[in-house]
């Protein structure tokens, strides 16, 4: 094992089992076992004072006046942990702190580049057109640039003004690609454990004891076998590329495929904007095909969107605290959140009619996404291999989704409730 990794393990995970760090082609580095170990074995423990979390960054702030000088304690506590961690990493990179601080060995093993699209050259970002992450990547790049400009303007006479835009973008990529969930309010960065690569057939997991973060096996492993964790079985190809900079390997002929699309504003619905203000987050539609091949989708807002005023028991426009118009509503005599509305619709006597409307709208959104996908797939523009592969995976998913949606629509059109409604509309017209 390279001496710098040996020193890293000894400092941050003292007492670790027999492991080594090796380079892996196209994957950077990975952790390998030097012995056979059984499921349940704790391979290593990182004491909580050796992980990067709010508490340890706060301790660093308390010990370093220059680092702390940019914000009062109240201002610091108002920052997200992401911002705190990025400032912490950037401060260490600037070399202001003497190279004897405890985090130096962690800093030396961090990758100099990560293949996340936010760090791609602008021309290559455009190769993502037609995929579900093209717009999110463009928005993220813009937000990172705005954050960096704000830092430079606000701290023009202090150390943050020395942070370059590439360093700020890289700090964000490091945070999102290496952070791990914790029982605390925020995720954490864990030296050594963060060297574990992803596998859908992982053999290890992490957990927390009272005073340490542990990496333990949940399968038996052989000598020289790589130790892997699962970055998220519910995450699809787009999210992996967006957050980690790579596309996950298929599981045989199966792969978890997820597409998340922003539901566009409906210019034909005068109540659309008011309905959207009832949502805590921008309304999305999510299509999923899991590793077993099972297909499902999720879009609670569509159930709200397809309801007309006369479909509600009560529906009135009101002003929220910012004096923006929103809606106060009840469906079949009950108040509920947009997220819970689908459950009420399922119990309605007019269920089939409402579900038909929802499926028709979902079909329109999937069809529009597929058309955009196909247009870009055959665009002669030179594309990165990751972009081409993501286009193919999302095209396959959308075609599968459309077959399912259209099959359900054809069945719903034969429903007694739907047939009677169509007949009543024909008579009225």
From Swiss-Prot:
Mind listing the GO molecular function terms for this protein?
Answer: protein-lysine N-methyltransferase activity
Name the keywords, alphabetized.
Cytoplasm, Methyltransferase, Nucleus, S-adenosyl-L-methionine, Transferase
The UniProt entry's GO biological process terms, in alphabetical order, are: methylation
Q: What is its main location?
A: cytoplasm
Compartments in which it is found: Cytoplasm; Nucleus
Q: Name one Pfam family in it.
A: SET
Instruction: Give the protein's recorded name.
Output: SET domain-containing protein 8
Q: What SMART domains has UniProt attached to this entry?
A: SET (SM00317)
Any one GO CC term of the record? cytosol
Organism from which the protein derives: Schizosaccharomyces pombe (strain 972 / ATCC 24843)
EC number per UniProt: 2.1.1.-
| Coiled-coil regions listed in the entry | none
Belongs to which family? Answer: Belongs to the class V-like SAM-binding methyltransferase superfamily.
Q: Which domain of life is it from?
A: Eukaryota
Residue ranges occupied by any SET domain in the UniProt entry: 17-232
Q: What range does the record give for the signal peptide? A: none
